[in-house]
């Protein structure tokens, strides 16, 4: 869902 996509985006930005 949207939460999963947002979590992936945050993970990508933080890495």
From Swiss-Prot:
Keywords: Amidation, Amphibian defense peptide, Secreted
Segments passing through the bilayer: none
Modification type Serine amide: residues: 15
Tissue expression remark: Expressed by the skin glands.
GO cellular component, one term: extracellular region
GO biological processes: defense response; negative regulation of nitric-oxide synthase activity
Domain of life where this protein originates: Eukaryota
Subcellular localization, as worded in the UniProt entry: Secreted
Function of the molecule: Inhibits the formation of NO by neuronal nitric oxide synthase with an IC(50) of 26.4 uM.
Name of this chain's protein: Signiferin-4.2
Organism from which the protein derives: Crinia signifera (Common eastern froglet)
Organism placement in taxonomy: Eukaryota, Metazoa, Chordata, Craniata, Vertebrata
